[in-house]
A protein has these predicted regions:
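Active-site-adjacent alpha-helix of alpha/beta-hydrolase-fold enzymes
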Residues: 244-320
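Gly/Ala-rich beta-loop-alpha elbow adjacent to hydrolase catalytic centers
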Residues: 161-165, 169
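Residue in the alpha/beta-hydrolase core beta-strand immediately N-terminal to the catalytic nucleophile
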Residues: 156-158, 227
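The feature captures the conserved acid-bearing segment of alpha/beta-hydrolase catalytic domains
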Residues: 200-279
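Short beta-to-alpha linker loops that shape the active-site pocket of alpha/beta-hydrolase fold enzymes
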Residues: 45, 111-115, 288
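Short substrate-entry loop that stabilizes the transition state in hydrolases
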Residues: 69-77, 82-120, 258-263
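Alpha/beta-hydrolase active-site loop
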Residues: 124-150, 171-173, 180-198, 203, ...
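Domain-level recognition of soluble alpha/beta enzyme cores
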Residues: 19-82, 301
Length: 320
């Protein structure tokens, strides 16, 4: 299924090339809006050298094969900004970012401050506009590195993201949020996992945010197309909020009606967001569930998660 997701975005953004292991570099990027640096990663077509590594591997998840420190091929390459989900990290989308790099893209991803695995504050992490600032800063950083900028094609810049990162990609493409519309949904919606009641239980307070921040446009005119996998925050969003969105949009939904996560269901039976993008390319991956977009789990992964009281992210529907 993950290969299909990568292929779907490749059709939108990248012309596939011969697949060699992706080159990889860890980078630090200044994020003045956070008052600190953020960790990032470059994934790129390699031309030799580097140390073979399984990036992001741990007791629960298998890692992603990369060549750490490999030489970068000549380019120029399209640039893709990648955004992980709330509480995720760079490695959580490693299968996708490495796959895009192997296919001929220069990909940059960051650990979003306040909303990553070991740096998490829900109230701060829900300030979705800081995530667009993160990726804008990453793109600015890339453009300021002469050796990297020479290999980048800045006429082909794209954004991709998963869950909260899916919203980040859409917002960079011009979509605007609707705080009161989202809050109204929370007042009328039945309790459902990972949505309103769960946010409140975890200590989030939607009334603490200002519409001026939540609803403001965050479009970056350098973005030519976006792909969003199970994007969050689409409740309350109407056609007026999408009027500045780039034309080339790929929406990927995970699961059928029985297995879709309500918080990220953009279908007619969910937020209905899909009806406001008549020109978008829509793909549904089933059988699947929201967490099917995470890396492949190891055999002992479910037991480790259960012992730690963590979310059952390894419990994919049969046949996934």
């Amino acid at each position: 299924m993950k290969h299909l997701l990568a292929a779907g975005f490749l059709l939108l953004a990248v012309q596939a090339a011969a697949a060699e292991p992706a080159g990889f570099r860890s980078v630090a990027i200044s994020a003045g809006h956070h008052g600190r640096d953020m960790s990032g990663a470059l994934w790129y077509p390699s031309s030799g050298g580097g140390e073979a590594n399984s990036y992001g591997e741990n007791g629960v998840f298998f890692g992603t094969r990369v060549l750490d420190g490999a030489q970068m091929a000549e380019g120029p390459f399209p640039v893709i900004l990648a955004s992980h989900g709330l509480g995720g990290n760079i490695g959580a989308l490693g299968w996708l970012t490495a796959g895009l790099a192997e296919a001929g893209a220069l990909v940059i991803s960051v650990n979003h401050p306040n909303s990553t695995t070991r740096d998490f504050n829900l109230q701060e992490g829900l300030k979705h506009w800081t995530r667009t600032q993160d990726l804008r800063a990453a793109l600015d950083w890339l453009a300021a590195q002469p050796d990297l900028a020479a290999r980048a094609d800045f006429s082909r810049v794209y954004a991709v993201g998963y869950s909260a990162g899916g919203w980040t990609a859409l917002a960079l493409g011009g979509l605007r949020a609707n705080l009161w519309g989202y809050a109204a949904r929370c007042e009328t919606a039945p309790p459902s996992p990972w949505q309103c009641a769960d946010l409140t239980r975890r200590g989030a307070d939607l009334t603490a945010y200002s519409p001026e921040d939540w609803d403001a446009g965050r479009k970056d005119d350098r973005i030519r197309a976006v792909a969003a996998i199970d994007p969050a925050l689409t409740y309350g969003v109407g056609r007026v909020h999408a009027r500045d969105l780039v034309e080339r949009v790929l929406l990927i939904g995970l699961g059928n009606r029985e297995t879709r996560l309500p918080a990220t269901d953009f279908s007619a039976t969910g937020s209905g967001f899909v009806s406001h993008l008549p020109a978008a390319e829509i793909e549904t991956m089933a059988p699947a569930a929201h967490f099917s977009a995470l890396p492949a789990c190891k055999p002992r992964g479910p037991a480790i998660l259960a012992a730690e009281g963590d979310d059952p992210v390894c419990d994919d529907p049969p046949g996934t």
